[in-house]
């Protein structure tokens, strides 16, 4: 897989030709696969139950606030259960194994290393719950190559709120005009642009890498 990644990247492009200095990555659906639907389907719940659990867990405001991690994991799971108490046992099991929604990609580590080799500074800005981070950190092998990271659970801020972008820029003294942010969600990209950061909405590795090369 590594040679395929390098084949897609322009290895002759030099960072000295660019105004871009900093590459900022989201994690879920960018550097790792995040697929809650396939994970939830794997339980084989009846459709009515499956859809209700999707609603009160993965599609809920509680799930989003869990990324902020201002409360304990137990608190967030209890809130989900309160929304559908008839499915308490299954909700708790779904949450107990929720790290299974995250899978490594075959390009992330190579991509980050490639950008570092070109002289870019690489950072992480990601909505990530404390419990999930603790249980999936072994899948985030690219972290050892980055220059810095802001995870929502560590700063109690979440995208697309402006504060989390300001936290990243301030902590690492980044010039937004010399920075580009890659995220799969349009609203998160737009929030970055409002802070003066260039943004690319990630749809695939090939598409994002090509847009990044054009920008950089």
Q: Where in this protein do the model-derived segments appear?
A:
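Asp-based, Mg2+/Mn2+-dependent phosphohydrolase catalytic module
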Residues: 6-11, 15-20, 129-130, 134-216
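Generic structural signal for small/hydrophobic residues in well-ordered secondary structure
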Residues: 26-29, 69, 115, 124, ...
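Hydrophobic residues in well-ordered beta-strands that form the structural core
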Residues: 33, 124-126, 201
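Glycine-centered short loops/turns at secondary-structure junctions
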Residues: 117-119, 196
